[in-house]
């Protein structure tokens, strides 16, 4: 098995095409096959080098390794070779309509209730019409056998059929000499022996046309898999939705773990449960294209965030310590295991370091100020450790006649500035006695600890 992921470098990778890449990769790896990365950059006016690098960076970050990679812009001679062959065979023909003329034809056919299929007028041009087009650069179409039925067994959609008479002869070369998507894609799939083509359902009509090109070139037609499109905020996801929220680089920047994204994207739209996975081995071993369905899929950042929290809260110190160094964070193993259950991303450890070592803002009720002052008076005159803090909290509870909650909440606010977090007896030693005393003093007087 050989699959390929073929992005156009006209934007940064988003969750929609990342899902396609992941499924191509999982399918290949589950069958001990190969995964190819093909950069579809034949449209030089829209392709940018920064997007090529961005695609590779995102795939690398997601640990979706490829067995080979190439850019279509390096294979133009090969496309020309096949183009010339088909031109000599009369399968490709030149056309001279302007875009305005084509738009007018399309509009007229739609008004007549007819499918907007190209009328092949370029094949019927008189000598006078040819002279009228003198000086115009031609574009080229590939002639399809319109008497045939195009059928394939899609691994998600089942049997799919098209009547070729309802399909326009595809434009394969523009007036400026550049190729459209259709033609180079098929040439590459043949030359690189692609066995399975996995992509979004918006390519179904393209597949019908491309099967015709495979047949014209007398090549074996690959297996096709068309996945339902991912929706985001009621819009189909594409590189032009205009929201950074769906870009992989954005998810990386806000602290999402690669495995959270992969755990989510690999199972969404399947009959399998979406669960956090520690590594992708389980995803590879459990992958089965038959579990995918045709129902629309809605992307939820909240769902990924929940998976992310569960994954982060299971990370060992060995897996995060180098990241702390890279981020300039001084986080010990003991501190990580203390606050781990209270973070949603690895970066959140910075907040807890700041709580322990920086200024905090508190909002203590007036009714609790006397209580805070009395609690401070009970603090032992010794360095804090977990046992000392437990004994202190127990003594406060006994002398104040307050419930555990009414003891802990104001003390937590006074010493940390937040209402939730790790056990107070375990956290206070990291703040240190002198700072705890200062914060209690400020809180008892209604001041911020700054």
From Swiss-Prot:
A motif ('KMSKS' region) lies at residues 236-240. ATP binds at residue 239. Gene3D superfamilies: 1.10.10.350, HUPs. InterPro entries: aa-tRNA-synth_I_cd-bd, aa-tRNA-synth_I_codon-bd_sub2, aa-tRNA-synth_I_CS, aa_tRNA-synth_I_cd-bd_sf, Glu-tRNA-ligase_bac/mito, Glu/Gln-tRNA-synth, Glu/Gln-tRNA-synth_Ib_cat-dom, GluQ/Sye. One of its GO terms (biological process) is glutamyl-tRNA aminoacylation. Its EC number is 6.1.1.17. SUPFAM superfamilies: An anticodon-binding domain of class I aminoacyl-tRNA synthetases, Nucleotidylyl transferase. It is found in: Cytoplasm. It comes from the Bacteria. GO terms for molecular function: ATP binding; glutamate-tRNA ligase activity; tRNA binding. Keywords: Aminoacyl-tRNA synthetase, ATP-binding, Cytoplasm, Ligase, Nucleotide-binding, Protein biosynthesis. A motif ('HIGH' region) lies at residues 7-17. Signal peptide: none annotated. One of its GO terms (cellular component) is cytoplasm. It catalyses: tRNA(Glu) + L-glutamate + ATP = L-glutamyl-tRNA(Glu) + AMP + diphosphate. NCBIfam families: gltX_bact. Catalyzes the attachment of glutamate to tRNA(Glu) in a two-step reaction: glutamate is first activated by ATP to form Glu-AMP and then transferred to the acceptor end of tRNA(Glu). Belongs to the class-I aminoacyl-tRNA synthetase family. Glutamate--tRNA ligase type 1 subfamily. Monomer. This is Glutamate--tRNA ligase 1. It comes from Anaplasma phagocytophilum (strain HZ).
